[in-house]
């Protein structure tokens, strides 16, 4: 016999799913109707009536598919099929099935009924496919909407950043309204240059060099570039970059290279020499043979410090006293690619001891002399040191303790005035990592944006 069961859900599909969970996927849907429409405050409600064929205890024969209450004396098979067909049609409308997908006509329904095939299988399968397609379309539409919103948000953020930049420039102009700085030649420094002028002045740059840069900028910088602080700083950065000289590291050795480090006491010559030894022997693509000679026989612990580094790096080290011994050790280290010479630190005012170093340099060997200076030294003292050690024939400059200085204006001024190139920079105390080949770009960045250790940034 056939029994009828009623199930409800927020959607027709949900109600059908509940019915199928009780009676199986082949459940015959007899009727579907919308009880309550979905609103903003309440969910929809659909009711579905299913017909289930159950075995009767008294009647083993198959029960009719249509309830007896629906039979009429005039009701024939054609009317039953019509009623079932209209029920299926109503389900299609509720599930959103288009007319093009209605491929089960009245005649086909009749044929299926005659063959005892379940009428609901094909429409339900079509409903599932349509629901899946609709879900995919909805997801694609949602994705497009999200992308549009994200693009719009990015444009709004860019616009906000642009407005903030304009506000910052306006504030700087307001702050500099009372700016009345003049250089020694009574040339007014425009308000637009106030920020960069103060920054360069605080760095320790020689005033005459700074005024020279300002004068050059006023003459050459287009007016349209003075609109905001960013373009002014960019232009000033380029001027500074051209102001100093840096020499690239020369590793094309046709013969052994002898490098002597000279300079005052306490600038870090010995530590810098250890960094160079490690760099040449271990840190480059080619591992060069390195030997060390020290002339520092006066400072307590100097030889011990260098010997410790030399033993760690498995390289020879010799201490010499006079030019004759120096020549012998140079010959003994003939097999080396680099010979590094450490010297005793001398005051720039001790002309006699500085002149004593010249005996070693004038021994007939091609020696590159590097003056080691600390950027913590003010420009006036730095210039005195350079002038005093200049008698040795300075080839390059090495600057140390960049991590201990707040400004590099003194460095820029000395290099600009001496026209000597910078070879290396010591950016920290770690051996061997904190040694960097000097570049214009890095020095300008440190001066305008503050010091940064490239080794720690990479880590």
Swiss-Prot record:
SUPFAM superfamilies: P-loop containing nucleoside triphosphate hydrolases (SSF52540). Keywords: Bacterial flagellum biogenesis, Bacterial flagellum protein export, Cell membrane, GTP-binding, Membrane, Nucleotide-binding, Protein transport, Transport. It comes from the Bacteria. GO terms for molecular function: ATP hydrolysis activity; GTP binding; GTPase activity; signal recognition particle binding. GTP binds at residues 263-270, 342-346, 400-403. Pfam families: SRP54 (PF00448). Necessary for flagellar biosynthesis. May be involved in translocation of the flagellum. This is Flagellar biosynthesis protein FlhF. It comes from Helicobacter pylori (strain ATCC 700392 / 26695). The lineage of its organism: Bacteria, Pseudomonadati, Campylobacterota, Epsilonproteobacteria, Campylobacterales.
